[in-house]
Curated annotation (Swiss-Prot):
It comes from Sorangium cellulosum (strain So ce56) (Polyangium cellulosum (strain So ce56)). GO terms for molecular function: fructose 1,6-bisphosphate 1-phosphatase activity; magnesium ion binding. The keyword Metal-binding applies. Binds 2 magnesium ions per subunit. The lineage of its organism: Bacteria, Pseudomonadati, Myxococcota, Polyangia, Polyangiales. Substrate binds at residues 131-134, 224, 257, 286. One of its GO terms (biological process) is fructose 1,6-bisphosphate metabolic process. Its EC number is 3.1.3.11. Mg(2+) 2 binds at residues 128, 131, 292. It is found in: Cytoplasm. This is Fructose-1,6-bisphosphatase class 1. Mg(2+) 1 binds at residues 107, 128, 130. Its main location: cytoplasm. Belongs to the FBPase class 1 family. Pathway: Carbohydrate biosynthesis; gluconeogenesis.
Amino acid sequence: MSDQRDLSWKPPDAPSRIGITLETYILEGMLGFPAATGAFTSLLNQLGLVAKLVTSKVRRAGLANVLGYTGQTNVQGEVVQKLDEVANETLLSVLGRRGHCAAVVSEELGEMRLLSTDPRAKYIVVVDPLDGSSNIDVNISIGTIFGVLRKSDAKMGADPSDFLRPGRDLVAAGYVLYGSSTLLVITTGLGGVHGFTYDPTVGEFFLSHENIRIPERGSTYSINEGHSARWPEDVRRWNAWIKEDSKPEGRPYGARYVGSLVADAHRTLLKGGIFAYPADRSGQGKLRLLYEASPFAFIFEAAGGKASTGAERILDRVPRSLHERVPLVLGSPRDVEDFEQFVRGER
């Protein structure tokens, strides 16, 4: 028998984890942290439970009389939809049960909501409970966006200053897309970006999109061109350029815009290209830094993409207030770099 090695042999690929539950994925992720107390695992599982409960509400919205407006306005000056209120109260109720979350900043609340003064409550959560609520009555996909931070120190409770930190301090971020099926996409930054599809027959999220990676360049752009009269000249020049006919450079790009941030960003994450909600001429953006821009920036960078205001990296921006608004550009790295070059006047 020959003792010569077979140089053509290669070790088998790591087995796919497609089909594992969200709970199993979270538990496996903690195996590399021997000192883990279980608090982070429990908090992420609570967010998964919120997604299940809101899914149930969304599915029965028309029958349960929770479509339409409450007549109230939130801190953003937006008329509150009934489902917005339901989603927000569901999240606060679930996160307040186990004492792992010290406080929450929500789009629906003017101020920080303190949930626990126990020093063992190490985490704080930022959330848009139901993004795209203007689409609720017309049955277009909507979503939940969240981010998790560690509390600044072991003091008894949290205060608003705990939240005024750059997105690079996030320890987890994700979103839930309520569409033809419910999909939860989550990352802890280090282990990649993974998507879990909800199976209502067994009440579990199962891994369906493993290690999502955004393409280096895409072929679509997502922007509300109805606002073009309000854009700065550099954004208008970029918008005209991306629609020019140049086959060698892969242009024109196709337009894809729903008007629901979670839906538009999700498609961009999977297919590549660029999503942009630029500043108007005054320099003001529309999307909230803490619970919209930063979580998506954290997700896109973990998937190999880029996220920018057009002038600076989103994850480096320090919030000045809980509900600060910023411009947001997300997408394939080369597409975002093209946009930034126009903003800098290099094109």
